[in-house]
A protein has these predicted regions:
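Beta-strand-rich solenoid/repeat architectures in extracellular/passenger domains
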Residues: 1-3, 14-29, 40-54, 66-81, ...
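Short, solvent-exposed loop/turn segments that connect beta-strands within catalytic domains
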Residues: 197-200, 278-280, 579-582
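Extracellular beta-solenoid/beta-roll
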Residues: 280-284, 292-297, 302-436, 440, ...
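Polar/charged side chains located within well-ordered beta-strands of beta-rich proteins
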Residues: 17, 35, 60-61, 73, ...
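Outer membrane beta-barrel translocator domains of Type V secretion systems
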Residues: 504-631
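Primarily extracellular Gram-negative trimeric autotransporter adhesin
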Residues: 62, 114, 347, 367-375, ...
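Glycine-rich beta-solenoid repeat tracts in large extracellular/virion proteins
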Residues: 5-11, 31-37, 56-62, 82-88, ...
Length: 631
């Protein structure tokens, strides 16, 4: 019947049921369990089902109503606006391994209303909601909900919600290893929000969160005037058109702990998006973070307004960074801020658009693969690589207001067959530090030692003042080195200093290549010395002999190399024939050479083995003939 109850405890009464309690209730506005006005219900184990619009399976009601349900219990509700497990200014506790389910438009599997409402759910709970506008866990206006570790929460339906904390001081805490899956257009995984003029709500998750949201216009995390704190090692996945991984607006804040990964896929997809119409919104990366966006017209980071920053450590300015792996573009709008300290081994692949906002990138021992024209407000390039060759052999321009750092490299595409065809760096304000420009020829002609002669005069960088310095990195061809030289030209018309390609010198390292010929000559020279001994010392020199010798050759400077070796030789010879006109000696030897070579780029080993046959003939008038054969 409509408005009926299964079990009710009120006015201090207590109901205690041992064993399994099974309750089925049907009818609009009906309730399976209700405890109100200090009433208490204790069930060791229960299976409760309520069917009907606006039904509630379990309700811990106002004025101190309390309900305790043991582990391995099932609570289900079905109908429009139905609630499975609910507390309205009362207390409800459910044990481990619970199944809590609600089906219907606007249905809530777990619902807390008003201050003093508290719900606690044990480990490994399965919480399910199905229907348009349905929610798995919902805390409203001061209610507190605590879901222990290893929970699985799902919501399925248009505009469905996985977890919602709404209005004044509502708070939800999720334990470690929580899994949340939400499906439907307009769906949201975690939603913390409030109405204007009220205190915001909070959602806190433990470590190892798995959050998956699917549907057009869907969002992984949504915070407006509310706060969401995501624990370490979370994985957030969102797919569909016009989707967002993390969204913060109108004083909404989201903090992402260490080793969080956000993956977003679809048309007009955003990894992190901040926006506000009044006070600021923010997303703070408090440790290592991966943001992967697969979208032709989306962004990895978009601060339309508000801020996306590295770790603030409780302050208002960035205090520390992290190792970031970011695939996708960055953009800021008016008053928008992106401020990241990209620490060792960070990789950013994408382009940037500072617009009327502020993008600050501090790179230390990191890589930025630039995929198109980009603008940055502040950039530190400290021992990092900015690779502008990732734009499909196009020519891109990187414009930076303030550039600093030391030991950084900027790799530029260049067409070596014509002048003024290259990537370009422009610094519009301050320029400090020492930076290296490295050139990559786009026509795959690195093996051509004449390459670059027609590119003289190409402007590679233009700076508006400052005492920074660019140097060119030498290039390595297959059999040659290229030394690039830069020079500067001050233009009175635009007040910029232009760094251009002055000359290219091609060097053939023949000195190093000649090392092999040198060692071969030294090997033969040893045999010639031995035959000289035979000619001068005759019978006393013949017989077995051993020689060991070593040597080193090389050069210093820009294209230095070093080659060193040790040669071992063992032989035997004797007099072969003697007449009144000449004396002939012959012998055989085995030689082994062990060497190593090191060059400015690369190294190698040199080894040689040979069997040598030799004859020397000395005439009685002083002439001689030496013959050597090698195998």
């Amino acid at each position: 019947n409509n408005g009926s109850w299964g079990i009710e405890a009120s006015s201090g009464a207590t109901v205690n049921v041992d064993g399994l309690a099974q309750i089925n209730i049907f009818g609009e506005d009906s309730m399976g369990l209700q405890a109100v006005s200090t009433g208490k219900i204790i069930l060791e184990r229960a299976i409760i089902k309520a069917v009907g619009n606006n039904t509630t399976a379990v309700l811990g009601d106002e004025n101190g109503g309390e309900i305790y349900i043991g582990g391995n219990s099932i609570v289900e509700a079905e109908g429009e606006g139905a609630k499975a497990l609910s507390a309205t200014a009362g207390y409800v506790e459910m044990g481990a391994d619970a199944l809590i389910s609600a089906v219907g438009k606007g249905a809530n599997a777990v619902r807390g209303n008003y201050a003093d409402a508290e719900i606690k759910i044990g480990e490994s709970a399965l919480i399910e909601a199905q229907g348009e506008n349905a929610a798995g866990v919902y805390a409203w206006w001061g209610a507190v909900i605590d879901v222990a570790d290893n929970a699985v929460i799902s919501a399925d339906g248009k505009n469905s919600r996985g977890v919602v904390a709404q209005h004044t001081n509502a708070e939800i805490t999720l334990g470690d290893s929580t899994q949340i899956e939400v499906n439907g257009d307009g769906a949201i995984g975690l939603m913390a929000t409030a109405q204007s003029g009220f205190e915001g709500s909070k959602i806190n998750t433990g470590e190892d969160l798995l959050l998956a949201v699917s549907g057009n216009d869907a969002m992984g995390i949504y915070a407006t005037m509310g706060k969401t704190a995501v624990g370490a090692k979370a994985q957030i996945t969102v797919d569909g058109d016009n989707v967002t991984g993390v969204y913060a607006a109108d004083q909404g804040t989201v903090t992402l702990a260490d080793k969080v990964q956000i993956s977003v896929e679809g048309d007009s997809a955003y990894g992190i998006y901040t926006n506000h119409s009044g006070a600021g919104a923010s997303v703070e990366l408090q440790g290592d973070t991966a943001i992967l966006v697969n979208s032709d017209d989306g962004y990895a980071l978009y601060a339309k307004s508000g801020a996306i920053t590295s770790n603030l450590n409780g302050g208002t300015t960035v205090a520390s960074g992290g190792k970031y792996f970011i695939e996708g573009d960055m953009k800021t709008g008016t008053d928008g801020i992106i401020d990241l300290l990209m620490e060792q081994d960070s990789i950013f692949t994408g382009k940037t658009d500072a617009g009327d906002g502020n993008i600050s990138l501090g790179l230390t021992d990191s890589v930025w693969n630039v995929t198109g024209d980009s603008t940055v407000t502040h950039m530190i390039n400290q021992n990092s690589v900015i690779d502008m060759t990732s734009d499909n052999q196009g020519f891109s321009t990187l414009t930076v207001d303030h550039l600093s750092g030391n030991g950084g490299k900027i790799i530029l595409d260049i067409d070596g067959s014509v002048a003024h065809q290259s990537d370009k760096l422009i610094v519009t304000d301050t320029f400090t530090g020492n930076h290296v420009l490295s050139l990559k020829e786009i026509n795959a002609r690195e093996g051509d030692p004449t390459l670059g002669a027609d590119a003289h005069g190409t402007v590679l960088a233009s700076v508006n003042g400052g005492n920074g310095v660019f140097t060119a990195e030498d290039g390595e061809g297959t059999l040659y080195w290229q030394r690039y030289e830069l020079d500067t030209l001050n233009n009175s018309n635009d007040l910029y200093t232009h760094w251009y390609l002055k000359s290219i010198n091609t060097l053939n390292p023949g000195e190093a290549a000649g090392a092999l010929a040198y060692h071969t000559w030294r090997d033969s020279g040893t045999l010639l010395e031995r035959m000289g001994d035979l000619r001068h010392n005759g019978d006393t020199a013949q017989g077995a002999w051993v020689r060991v010798q070593g040597s080193k050759i090389g050069r210093e400077g820009k294209f230095k190399f070093e080659n060193k070796y040790t040669m071992y030789e063992l032989g035997y010879d004797q007099k072969m024939k003697q007449t009144d006109k000449y004396t002939r000696y012959g012998g055989v030897s085995f030689s082994y050479t062990d060497g190593s070579s090191s060059y400015r780029s690369g190294d190698g080993d040199n080894k040689n083995k040979a069997i040598n046959f030799y004859v020397t003939q000395l005439g009685n008038k002083g002439y001689y003939l030496d013959v050597v054969a090698k195998i």
